[in-house]
């Protein structure tokens, strides 16, 4: 029996998301893309992509995003985040990056057909080390030292990363990647 897999992709209209869409389509995969309502970048998504409009800050939208045909399985790639170079605190930043990730994790846990959860974090979430010291894998992101995780974007990604690692330790098949720009 061949089980159909749907790739659930958040942040699909962003730079990384569109590139992931392109790669998956070239492999013949089915993609369900989570995009913000009215996002003008949606027009760049390949026509083969199934578009789901919603808000990561809505637990109901995240739950609905995971609803796929019975007998199918899914893989969630959570790329969406609010990005800023402003180092200051922002409630919206925390709501989207941390709260949105919590909503996605809750939905994934509620849907056993979700076989894998991949969270796209940031190298900014990794505590900075003195110059010349090699970066090593980190398995604890919270609590963080404010002088080593600089700016609230990086801190929000560190907090969300910890949520994913905690979910993985609790049994969710989840992993984290830390791309750099």
Name every feature range the model reports, one short phrase each.
Residues 19, 23, 107, 163:
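Rossmann-fold NAD(P)-dependent oxidoreductase module
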Residues 102-152, 175:
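Conserved Rossmann-fold NAD(P)-dependent oxidoreductase catalytic core, especially the SDR/UDP-sugar
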């Amino acid at each position: 029996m061949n089980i159909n897999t749907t790739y659930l992709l958040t942040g699909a209209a962003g730079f990384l998301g569109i590139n992931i869409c392109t790669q998956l389509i070239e492999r013949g995969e089915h993609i369900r893309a989570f995009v913000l309502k009215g996002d003008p970048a949606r027009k760049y998504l390949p026509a083969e992509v199934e578009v789901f409009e919603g808000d990561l800050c809505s637990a109901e939208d995240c739950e609905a995003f995971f609803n796929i045909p019975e007998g199918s399985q899914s893989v969630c790639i959570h790329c969406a985040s609010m990005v800023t170079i402003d180092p200051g605190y922002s409630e919206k930043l925390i709501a989207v990056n941390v709260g949105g990730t919590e909503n996605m994790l809750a939905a994934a846990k509620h849907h056993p057909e979700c076989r894998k959860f991949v969270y796209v974090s940031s190298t900014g979430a990794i505590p900075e080390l003195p110059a010349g010291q090699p970066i090593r894998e980190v398995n604890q992101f919270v609590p963080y030292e404010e002088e080593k995780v600089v700016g609230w974007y990086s801190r929000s990604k560190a907090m969300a990363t910890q949520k994913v690692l905690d979910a993985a330790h609790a049994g969710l098949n989840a992993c984290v990647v830390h791309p750099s720009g």
